[in-house]
Amino acid sequence: MYLCPNKPKLQSTKNFKIMDYKIIDIEGVGDVYAEKLTAAGINKVSELLEKCADPKGRKALAEATEISEKLILRWTNHADLFRINGVGPQFSELLEKAGVDTVKEFRHRVAENLQPKLEEINAQYNICGRVPSIAEVQKMIDQAKELEPKMTY
């Protein structure tokens, strides 16, 4: 079912569970940004979400790394989506292109409407190896409904 075959181990923190990818695994981070984030103490996706879930944290990281707040917000949104089982780097990118950038947004979607949109976008941009079925998207939506929102703006 998973769209990312080499998924890391599930890590738990006090408020959420997340697949603990390396920071460089987020689409668009790359070596240069990963080095800046690592120098600021951000090595894992869970650390990014923990530190940057609120505007104050994003601003502080932007100042420390000289990375734009806009990019940090985008990456933190992806990190938020990683909390959903089956969502990894590529699928979070596809979801973003479909207008779903956080767990809170995902929970309000209708699988029967979202899944064809994902198919359409993936056909255009070739982001993922495969797009999940309507049933798989529904399971993700159901999980999003159970997760506590992390992101604040």
Residue ranges, per PLM feature:
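C-terminal extensions
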Residues: 14-153
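Short, Lys/Arg-enriched N-terminal segments with co-localized hydrophobic residues
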Residues: 2-18
